[in-house]
Amino acid sequence: VTPGLGFVYNNGMNRFDPREGRAGSIGPGKARIHLMMPSMAFKDGLVKVVFGAPGGNAILSALVQVFTNVVDFGMTAVEAVTSPRIHAESDKVWCEATIRSDLVDQLKNQGHQVHHDAASLSDNQARAQLVVIDKDLNFDGASDPRGPMGLVHSKN
């Protein structure tokens, strides 16, 4: 808030809780949360994965899933960014169309408010960018097709 003017310049206030006494409550001197997370992962002192995403509150969910897809499941960059995603925030869960309906039902049965998107690559998800570097210094990159620029993939 600009002193003397009393208004904010962007929608970052939507991440605060308007109710008093809660962890995310609005209050003097509090800064808004931002989720900008350009990230690099190293192994044996060498950069192995470089990744980030625009997408507001969905950034953290997307980056954890993309990174896990590469590190734990051995996916290529394209496979990692195009795999089905889930984003959870508060009591709401957004699932892309390709998330199995039995898993969606399980989330609903656990009391979650689930939105099962009609789209396989939903714009409710953040748009991850990813470069994976192998031991021979070959680059495998992908740009999430959920965004307007589509999918870019290069491997050399």
Where are these regions (language model features)?
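Proteins synthesized as precursors that undergo proteolytic processing into mature forms
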Residues: 1-118
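Terminal-appendage/accessory-domain detector
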Residues: 75-76, 92, 102-120, 124-156
